[in-house]
Amino acid sequence: VAAAIVLILVVLFVYGAATNPAYGWSTYGKYLFDSRILVGAGYTLLLTVLAMVIAVILGVLLAIMRLSPNVVLRSVSWVYLWIFRGTPVYVQLVFWGLFPSIYKRIDLGIPFVVQFAHLNMQDLYSAFLFAMIGLALNESAYMAEIVRAGVSSVGEGQTEASIALGMSWSQTMRRTVLPQAMRVIIPPTGNEVISMLKTTSLVVAVPFTGELFGVQADISGVNFQPIPLLMVASTWYLAVTSVLMVGQFYLERYYSRGASRQLTGRQLKAMAAAQNKVLAVDEESDERR
């Protein structure tokens, strides 16, 4: 009964959406593969990839600092995570958009001794660059916690064995702990990639309007039809997210190998054959006696 009710509700919703002129399906079809929308989707993917690459690298470094025996490194990492996890990403992106106004000029050199060069931030301003930096720095704080959880999942015996073999702390992390921690790190990282794809819609706060959400907003601002344009953007977000979810599924299955005690059919047959051999040997021994 419950399934029938749900099915009826779904059919009614689909029928209502298909016949509702407010959705503007003709406009939706017109702009679904518009060149501007495709370029915006490309910028969305580019922002996602670049921001995640930087975030993963910084996240690993921050996690190592957090787990380091050095008090200064641990403190710096903790403060970084406190700031970037404790403030909304939208607010951070607004600050990055105002960065050239806060720091009009950056001097490079040895403080109070010599200056090698200076950078005029207003001349170097790039909305795409600051959007990428803002997303990456925010995400790196979450990646640091994911990496730290993965490292903590590795048994202490592994670390003790590496130290007994004469490895330093950094060698132990690089050669022993991190490779084993990947099984725990990879699945949530896939979730973060999908989340990052959707978070790129917030870079209008910088403001950068070249990505998918910004492009649809520009187009709907001209033709005054925001609903079909939002449907276009949602379709592309769903399409890319679906592809990423499929990739995440296979990646999780790959890294979960050996984590489960469930045997394959081939392994069960081999075990049965081995048991039969043992039984046959036992029977022969009994007959000889």
Which residues does each predicted region cover?
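Transmembrane alpha-helices and adjacent helix-loop boundaries
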Residues: 1-289
